[in-house]
A protein has these predicted regions:
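Segments of small-molecule ligand-sensing domains
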Residues: 284, 288-358, 377-381
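Extracytoplasmic "Venus flytrap"
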Residues: 9, 13-53
């Protein structure tokens, strides 16, 4: 089944839309790409649609030489595996599956006989198939990169890791702590229970006492933006504080709490730098609602198409892309396939009230430009 295109609306300000990120003109053979997504799954249809929309937005802007065939699947890993076998017979490259269990099933099936771009990280003990490249977004990769970034900026001293009881918080805290230890650094972990969106008051009081008696060099927050806001309201904002995409409060200046000013975190260019050249040329996606997670999956779809397009031209080479999800490095050499994503580092700006008034060339007053929520910073990654 061939996919439907995504319409490219005009930019929000009415000006011509920025050019799509430049790539070398397509000079490979005509290629058929199967997009294998759980669009028939009750649980995963919405995430799958976000990926599909991003993939097709990228294809519509750079369609030369590439035919996309959509292969919808259901919930089960076996259904995805059966669909993969059929897709591999009729296509040159397969993009998918999306579900972690389906990727794991495929990775251990022996069925991978075409270049395959998996959209999630399988939890398997055996090496991945030679023709499988995994490009899914990873909480753990983010946390490890934040550890490297923080270590480069804070070369001495202990890190205090703040986490909650949710599984994703534990994963972030564990990945940061492991990488921090590998870098030869010391850390302590404090768990902050929360219920109904509110961090436990007794835990915050204990944290204040701890910081007073044993101040760390920095804080790593495996929390969401709301939890981190409550922590900083309680203990102050003086300590250097790092996080991953989970602490992103969104791009609306009015919704960013003052307590988050100065927090440094990694996230996708798509969600923190809408004017970045790798992002601005693509249509924004509104069908996923206001949450950031659907937007991240849409950006993953954009980059999945771009990686597939490059792979068609350089099946055994190495290449880099300035993508919607970060700076991508792919090596398709004779050894194990390698993929690395480096996300954008930003600091939350202080967007408090201002009386700034600009004067135009005619001497009249004009409205100040929109204030940016995030300031990109060098991470050294």
């Amino acid at each position: 089944m061939q996919t439907n295109p995504v319409e490219l609306p005009p930019s929000a300000d009415g000006n011509p839309r920025a050019a799509a990120p430049s790539s070398a003109p397509y000079n490979g053979p005509a290629v058929r790409v199967a997009l294998l997504l759980p669009l028939d799954s009750q649980a995963l249809a919405q995430p799958a649609e976000a990926v599909r929309a991003g993939f097709m937005a990228a294809h519509q802007l750079q369609p030369e030489g590439v035919t996309v065939n959509l292969v919808p699947t259901g919930d089960s890993a076996q259904a995805a595996l059966d669909a993969y076998r059929g897709a591999a017979e009729q296509n040159d490259i397969v993009v998918g599956p999306l579900a972690r269990s389906a990727v794991a099933s495929l990775a251990t099936s022996g069925a991978v006989n075409k270049p395959t771009i998996a959209l999630n990280h399988p939890q398997v003990n055996s090496p991945l198939p030679r023709q499988m490249l995994v490009i899914g977004l990873s909480l753990e990769d983010e946390a490890r990169q934040v550890a490297e970034w923080a270590a480069s900026e804070q070369p001495v001293g202990q890190a205090l890791v703040l986490t909650g009881r949710a599984a994703w918080q534990q994963r972030l805290a564990g990945a940061f702590s492991q990488r921090w230890a590998e870098l030869g650094r010391s850390q302590a972990t404090v768990e902050l229970p929360a219920e109904g969106g509110y961090v436990d008051g007794n835990a915050l009081a204990e944290l204040r006492a701890r910081l007073s008696s044993e101040p760390p060099q920095l804080v790593y927050a495996a929390l969401d933006a709301n939890g981190l806001r409550q922590v900083r309201m309680s203990v102050g904002t003086s300590l250097p504080t790092y996080g991953t995409a989970s602490v992103n409060p969104g791009l609306d200046p009015a919704s960013v709490a003052a307590e988050l000013a100065g927090v440094r975190f990694l996230d996708l260019p798509w969600t923190v730098q809408p004017d970045h050249p790798a992002v601005a040329g693509y249509p924004r996606w509104s069908a996923g609602g206001q949450g950031l997670d659907p937007q991240r999956l849409y950006a993953l779809g954009i980059d999945a198409y771009r990686v597939a397009r490059e792979l068609a031209q350089r099946p055994n080479g190495a290449f880099e892309l300035d993508g919607a999800t970060g700076r991508l490095s792919v090596n398709m050499g004779q050894g194990e396939r390698a993929f690395r994503r480096v996300e954008t580092g930003v600091v939350v700006r202080d967007n408090g009230p201002t009386d700034q008034i600009l004067t135009d060339d005619a001497g009249g007053d004009s409205v100040p430009p929109p204030r940016r929520v995030f300031e990109p910073v060098s991470t050294g990654l």
